[in-house]
Every structure is written in structure tokens, then in C-alpha cells.
Amino acid sequence: MLPGFANGANCRFRHSDWPFLPVRPNGFGCIVLPGFYDGFRFYGMASVMSDLTVSKHFVQAALVGAERLGFDTREMLREAGISPDLLRIEMARVSSDQFSHLMQVLWNRMGDEFMGLGPRKARTGTFATMCALVIDCPNLESVYRQAFQFSRLFEPMVSMELEVGEDKAQLVARMEGEINDPSFFLRESILVIWHRLGSWLIGQPIELEKAEFDYPRPAHGDEYRHIFHCPLAFESDKIALTFDKRFLSAPVIRDKPEMRQFLKTSPADLLSRPDESNTFTGRIRALIGRDLSKPLPDFEWIAAELHTSPQTLRRRLKQENTSFQEIKDLLRRDMAIYYLSRQELPINDIAAKVGFTEPSTFHRAFKKWTGVTPGAYREGERGAPSD
């Protein structure tokens, strides 16, 4: 057993369960896993083409530490399949696959899961070790408590601590030392990873009731609506996620084979590819599908398919900080970006594929979404000849 896990353990690491991990002890008797990542997919859904996109803000924010430490970030972008020229477009977005690949490149090149943003390096393999420990935990509360104990083994500590009240539970960020995170990416990442990892382990979404941040609403704050799907509070006295206490008793339903598969692909997809099937937003996107060339289903049909009333569905979408019209618009935007990356498709054909009968209307809508025309966006995707 690792030191620091004697209090209510139930979570044990046995190398025989993880024979493929190159385990060696360090000077403190702790487990070190050198060089353990080979890519990322979310929740074992690697083969599914994702139609989700990620704001260029998160691409640039993820690169801040690498730039500060002198890495060639343009080369990192190219390795991830992202043209550096695309980032010149103010409202550019990349596919979730591209963003996931960028996370892999950063961690592999830097050997630091904090990507140069934390108060110290987090060696590649730290997340894998924590996951191997918590898979034997009986329920979500035990997962979060043991994960926090694991994080305390490293100084300065960067972690999330579980606090339990009468009806509510909170995951509260604990960050010691000086962080180099001007764009808040490290803090956002830790919240997202701990929340989505817990949801995966218990096989159900941990429905958030509130997300708090101890900094002013950032310029990219609108993106938070689609990340947390709950009310947001900025300039709070802490960074925390609040949810119903009942989730803490939910049993861990994943087993070691599932975790081994999960660790081949995580945690980058926890950041880039949220399990939106657990939200009304995601369910509506799934019902609409990817064929946007035909008339889309109306709101009443969608509500019936989801076994709810239109009034209730509107209220739930409001709780998720969105609307039916916004879901349709963003789905068209994301699919248009996906098709534009396929250079062989004429732009007029793309307009029809995403539901526009008039190319001029598509051009206006796309410029509203991204700040540039479809043609200019494609040029940015293609990059300069030197790329």
C-alpha cells in the first residue's frame, strides 16, 4: 500500500493487476510510472467521429507554459494537426480530436501533466497512478477522498478536496505555491478532470448545481456555459464544484480492464470530449444527428422523444445555460468547421450539408460564428505553404 492510504483504505495498488505499467519505487517508497500515455479518447468511444469543437482560447492557454519554457509551440501545433495560421482567426475553433492530440503532444514533449502551468512538474504517469489506486474504491466518496490523499504526497499540492455538508457536497481546489496560469487553464482542467472522472467511475453524470471561481469572469467565460452546464459564480472566495450529496454513495461500477482501456486514452479526452449524452444539450444534438441538410425536428418532437414536456425541457435547457436555437446554431457551426477541414468539399456543398439553401446566408452565419468567411477559415486551416 502507498504511504498515506491507511485511513479507510479500500483502495490498493497491486502491480500484478497492472503488469504493463513500468513501475519502480522512488526514494520515498511511492510508485512512479515513467512515460505512461499513448493517446486519448473519452469513455472508450475512440472510434466515434466527434462533431464537437474547442475554442482557440483553450489551445493558446494550454501552450502558455510551453512557450514560457522555450518549447517550439508552432511545431507542437503542427504535430497535433493544427495549423498555427488558424489561430490568427479571432474566433477560430479546432476539433476535439485536434485538441486531444495537442494535450498528448504537450505531455509527451514536456514530461509534465501540468504543462508548465503548476507550481511544480507533475510527471507523466501521475494521473494513471491515481486512477489505478481509486478503481478499487467502493463508492464516489471514497474515490475523492483517496485521490486527495494521493495528491497530498506531492508538494506543493495541487488537488481537489471533498467537503460534505448536510445536503450538498463540494469539490474545492487546493493549490499550494505559485502557479503560472494566467489564462486559468490549469484550474479549469483540474475541475473538469475530477468531475468527469468521477462521473465515469460511477457510470452516471454528477449533476453540478454550481461552479465557483475566485477570479473575475474571463473573456472566454461564455465557454464555461458549455463546460459545466450549471450556474456560474465568479469572484468567489474559492474554486469549487457543488453537487447533491447523494452522488457520494454511488458505487464504483468500473473494473480493472475498463480502467486499463480508459488509461490508454485519458485524461486529455476528459478535457476535450465531454460526455454530453448525459445532458439535455447532448441528447438533443444526438436526436438531431449529423445530417443537417434535411428539415430539423421541431421542439415538440424533441421533447416527446425525451419523454418530457416542452415546458420542462425549456426549463432544463435554461439550467444548462442554453436554448434549442443555440443548440441548432452551434451544431451547424461545428459541422461546418468539420467539413471545411475536408479540403475536397466545395463551400457551396458544405452550406447545403449544414442546412442552408442559400450559400450567401451560410456565409453570413459562418462569419457571425467565427468572425471570418468560410473561405478565409479554410485558408487558415490549410496554413501557409511553409506549414
What are these regions (language model features)?
Residues 103, 144, 191-194, 288:
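Hydrophobic alpha-helical core bundles mediating ligand binding, dimerization, or RNAP-core interactions
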Residues 3-171:
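N-terminal low-complexity or simple alpha-helical regulatory segments
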Residues 79-83, 214, 353:
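Short acidic/histidine-centered micro-motifs embedded in hydrophobic/aromatic stretches
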Residues 159, 163-248:
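DNA-contacting interfaces and partner/effector-binding or oligomerization modules
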Residues 128-134, 176-180, 248-249, 269-271:
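Short hinge/gating elements
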Residues 218, 223-387:
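Extended mid-to-C-terminal alpha-helical interaction segments
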Residues 46-64, 151, 157, 175-177, ...:
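Surface-exposed, interaction-prone regions with an acidic/low-complexity signature
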